[in-house]
C-alpha cells in the first residue's frame, strides 16, 4: 500500500500520516502548494472516476474539495513567479482553466489577457511560460485550434512603468489561420452506455458531403 510522509515546516521532522482522500489502489498526486506554504494541492480519484482537486491543510491535514472533475484528467498546471500553484487545466472539450482560489493572482492576470485580446478559454489557449523574479514581466503564448500561436511579453507595470504587451515571435508563420478548419467537440452515448468524446473537423473548401477520415485515440480520459 502507499505510505505518506509529511513535514509540517522546513525544520520539522518527517511524520507518517494518513490522508482521508486516498483509497487503496487509487490515484493520488501532489500538484503543488499555495504561496504561503500552508496548503498542498492534491489530485485524487477518491470520490470521482478521474482525479479531482483537493486542498490539504499542512498542519491539520483537513481536506477541502476545490474542483470536482468527472470527465477529463488534468492536462496542465499554472504556477506564479513565486512557485505558488494557482491554476489547473482540464480538456473535457475545450481547454478549461480552474483557478484554485477566488483571490488568485493568476486569475487576475488571465482575465486581463482575455479582455485585452477579446477571447476566452473556450476557443483560445493562453499559456504563461515564464515570469521575471519580481513578477512584473511574463512571457505567454496565445493559440487556438486554427492558429499555431504567437509569443508575447507582458509588462504588468508593477514597477511604475506603463503596462504593455509586445509581440515576440509567431509560430509557424507560413500557416494562415483563416484557412484552417475549426475543431468542434462532440460526445455521444455508445450502446454499452459509455459516453464517448471526440472532435470533428469540416473542410473550409469544397462542397458537402465530404469523405470521412476517423482517427481513434484515447482522450480525454
Listing of model-derived features with the role each one plays in the protein:
Residues 1-4, 13-43, 51-53, 71-88, ...:
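Conserved beta-propeller blade repeats
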Residues 3-6, 31, 53-55, 85, ...:
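Hydrophobic beta-strand positions in blades of beta-propellers and related beta-sheet-rich domains
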Residues 8-10, 57-61, 157-159:
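Short loop/turn segments that connect beta-strands within beta-propeller blades
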Residues 15-19, 64-70, 164-170:
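Beta-propeller fold detector
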Residues 46-49, 92-95, 144-147:
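Short glycine/acidic-enriched loop and turn motifs that connect beta-strands
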Residues 50-52, 148, 210:
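A detector of repeated loop/turn-to-beta-strand junctions in beta-rich toroidal repeat architectures
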Residues 97-205:
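Non-catalytic accessory segments flanking enzyme active sites
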Residues 208-218:
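Short beta-strand element of the alpha/beta-hydrolase
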Amino acid at each position: 500500500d502507499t505510505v505518506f510522509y509529511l513535514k509540517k515546516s522546513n525544520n520539522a521532522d518527517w511524520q507518517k500520516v494518513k490522508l482521508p482522500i486516498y483509497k487503496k489502489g487509487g490515484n493520488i498526486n501532489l500538484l503543488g502548494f499555495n504561496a504561503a506554504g500552508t496548503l498542498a494541492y492534491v489530485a485524487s480519484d477518491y470520490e470521482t472516476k478521474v482525479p479531482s482537486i483537493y486542498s490539504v491543510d499542512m498542519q491539520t491535514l483537513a481536506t477541502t474539495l476545490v474542483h470536482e472533475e468527472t470527465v477529463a484528467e488534468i492536462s496542465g498546471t499554472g504556477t506564479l513567479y513565486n512557485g505558488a500553484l494557482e491554476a489547473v487545466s482540464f480538456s473535457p472539450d475545450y481547454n478549461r482553466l480552474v483557478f484554485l482560489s477566488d483571490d488568485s493572482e493568476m486569475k487576475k492576470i488571465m482575465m486581463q489577457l482575455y479582455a485585452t485580446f477579446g477571447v476566452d478559454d473556450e476557443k483560445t489557449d493562453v499559456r504563461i511560460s515564464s515570469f521575471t523574479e519580481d513578477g512584473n514581466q511574463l512571457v505567454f503564448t496565445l493559440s487556438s485550434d486554427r492558429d499555431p500561436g504567437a509569443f508575447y511579453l507582458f509588462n504588468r507595470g508593477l514597477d511604475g512603468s506603463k503596462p504593455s504587451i509586445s509581440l515576440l515571435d509567431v509560430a509557424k508563420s507560413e500557416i494562415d489561420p483563416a484557412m484552417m478548419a475549426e475543431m468542434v467537440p462532440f460526445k455521444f452515448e455508445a450502446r454499452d452506455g459509455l459516453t464517448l468524446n471526440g472532435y470533428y473537423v469540416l473542410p473550409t473548401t469544397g462542397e458537402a458531403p465530404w469523405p470521412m477520415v476517423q482517427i481513434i485515440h484515447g482522450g480525454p480520459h
